[in-house]
Amino acid sequence: MSFTRQLSEMSASELNDAIDDTNFPQAHILSRGRNNSVCSTSSTSGTSSLADRQQNQAEEATAIAGTPVEEVAPAPALVPLAGNQRPRLILKTNGSSPDSDGTQPKTPLTPRTSTTPGHEKCTFHHDLELDHKPPTREALLPDMARSYRLLLGGLGENPDRQGLIKTPERAAKAMLYFTKGYDQSLEDVLNGAVFDEDHDEMVVVKDIEMFSMCEHHLVPFYGKVSIGYLPCNKILGLSKLARIVEIFSRRLQVQERLTKQIAVAVTQAVQPAGVAVVVEGVHMCMVMRGVQKINSKTVTSTMLGVFRDDPKTREEFLNLVNSK
């Protein structure tokens, strides 16, 4: 299945299901180039190559008397990791499935969701609505302007006085600009800027400026975003990382969800061995109101793939992000 078809023909839930974190870890680090060698990391702890997995699968198949390899149904297995890391679910495929071309991890038959016992309070990638897009938003401008006019009247102001007579329309246009990310899709922003490249070391772009709107109080929060990923023979144009930040920050947001959405979008774009995102934000809802803590900052992170499973890879990324 081609990358273009993935984005244009699959629904948001299908795209996000495909990278649920049961499918992301080390044993599914697959090459999308001309060979199937596993992508290298700063540490090989807990990883296995594609050839090893295929050999193990063949051995399991021949253990069943009289059963050819191709007839053995795929079965999930828990792979123990080094140290105190938790086991991860590895989905084995036999390559004969019509929807499996060997270039992409297979989606779990029953992906975990917030309704799965024990995960009621969790947010999974398929819950993030990356492709949410409302109806034509420019058509909402008159209604939005009328709402702002009512708001001014509710404050005891005269919306017809000279300084405010055009304020409702200006405020409505400003709000449309602040949330213009709803009008953008990942496919449009990437615009084909995904390139074959035999580069298997970490790529980090840090201190990307970000502005967003808190969905709780409709006041701004702003800060910086740092993104790192470990390529699997695919790299992304560097400016596209900043544009991905722009898509999701220009929406009504909470910082935690914004961080996840950026990480999932990079994963969809280049299917890397792992993605790491750190966001540092200043929230005006904490500065202008409430506790009024002017110097407070909020830091959130999302680690996927090797960045989540390999402490050395994660440490390397954090050192690069924190270096001056």
UniProtKB/Swiss-Prot annotation:
<dbReference type="GO" id="GO:0003934">
    <property type="term" value="F:GTP cyclohydrolase I activity"/>
</dbReference>
<feature type="region of interest" description="Disordered">
    <location>
        <begin position="33"/>
        <end position="59"/>
    </location>
</feature>
<keyword id="KW-0378">Hydrolase</keyword>
<dbReference type="GO" id="GO:0048072">
    <property type="term" value="P:compound eye pigmentation"/>
</dbReference>
<feature type="binding site">
    <location>
        <position position="214"/>
    </location>
    <ligand>
        <name>Zn(2+)</name>
    </ligand>
</feature>
<dbReference type="InterPro" id="IPR043133">
    <property type="entry name" value="GTP-CH-I_C/QueF"/>
</dbReference>
<feature type="binding site">
    <location>
        <position position="285"/>
    </location>
    <ligand>
        <name>Zn(2+)</name>
    </ligand>
</feature>
<keyword id="KW-0862">Zinc</keyword>
<dbReference type="GO" id="GO:2000274">
    <property type="term" value="P:regulation of epithelial cell migration, open tracheal system"/>
</dbReference>
<comment type="similarity">
    <text>Belongs to the GTP cyclohydrolase I family.</text>
</comment>
<keyword id="KW-0021">Allosteric enzyme</keyword>
<dbReference type="GO" id="GO:0048067">
    <property type="term" value="P:cuticle pigmentation"/>
</dbReference>
<dbReference type="GO" id="GO:0035185">
    <property type="term" value="P:preblastoderm mitotic cell cycle"/>
</dbReference>
<feature type="region of interest" description="Disordered">
    <location>
        <begin position="79"/>
        <end position="119"/>
    </location>
</feature>
<keyword id="KW-0783">Tetrahydrobiopterin biosynthesis</keyword>
<feature type="compositionally biased region" description="Low complexity">
    <location>
        <begin position="40"/>
        <end position="49"/>
    </location>
</feature>
<dbReference type="GO" id="GO:0005737">
    <property type="term" value="C:cytoplasm"/>
</dbReference>
<comment type="function">
    <text>Isoform B is required for eye pigment production, Isoform C may be required for normal embryonic development and segment pattern formation.</text>
</comment>
<dbReference type="InterPro" id="IPR043134">
    <property type="entry name" value="GTP-CH-I_N"/>
</dbReference>
<dbReference type="Pfam" id="PF01227">
    <property type="entry name" value="GTP_cyclohydroI"/>
</dbReference>
<dbReference type="GO" id="GO:0008363">
    <property type="term" value="P:larval chitin-based cuticle development"/>
</dbReference>
<dbReference type="GO" id="GO:0008270">
    <property type="term" value="F:zinc ion binding"/>
</dbReference>
<keyword id="KW-0342">GTP-binding</keyword>
<feature type="compositionally biased region" description="Polar residues">
    <location>
        <begin position="93"/>
        <end position="117"/>
    </location>
</feature>
<comment type="subunit">
    <text>Toroid-shaped homodecamer, composed of two pentamers of five dimers.</text>
</comment>
<dbReference type="InterPro" id="IPR018234">
    <property type="entry name" value="GTP_CycHdrlase_I_CS"/>
</dbReference>
<dbReference type="GO" id="GO:0009880">
    <property type="term" value="P:embryonic pattern specification"/>
</dbReference>
<feature type="compositionally biased region" description="Polar residues">
    <location>
        <begin position="50"/>
        <end position="59"/>
    </location>
</feature>
<comment type="pathway">
    <text>Cofactor biosynthesis; 7,8-dihydroneopterin triphosphate biosynthesis; 7,8-dihydroneopterin triphosphate from GTP: step 1/1.</text>
</comment>
<keyword id="KW-0479">Metal-binding</keyword>
<dbReference type="InterPro" id="IPR001474">
    <property type="entry name" value="GTP_CycHdrlase_I"/>
</dbReference>
<keyword id="KW-0547">Nucleotide-binding</keyword>
<dbReference type="GO" id="GO:0060308">
    <property type="term" value="F:GTP cyclohydrolase I regulator activity"/>
</dbReference>
<feature type="binding site">
    <location>
        <position position="217"/>
    </location>
    <ligand>
        <name>Zn(2+)</name>
    </ligand>
</feature>
<dbReference type="InterPro" id="IPR020602">
    <property type="entry name" value="GTP_CycHdrlase_I_dom"/>
</dbReference>
<protein>
    <recommendedName>
        <fullName>GTP cyclohydrolase 1</fullName>
        <ecNumber>3.5.4.16</ecNumber>
    </recommendedName>
</protein>
<dbReference type="GO" id="GO:0046654">
    <property type="term" value="P:tetrahydrofolate biosynthetic process"/>
</dbReference>
<dbReference type="GO" id="GO:0005525">
    <property type="term" value="F:GTP binding"/>
</dbReference>
<dbReference type="GO" id="GO:0006728">
    <property type="term" value="P:pteridine biosynthetic process"/>
</dbReference>
<dbReference type="GO" id="GO:0006729">
    <property type="term" value="P:tetrahydrobiopterin biosynthetic process"/>
</dbReference>
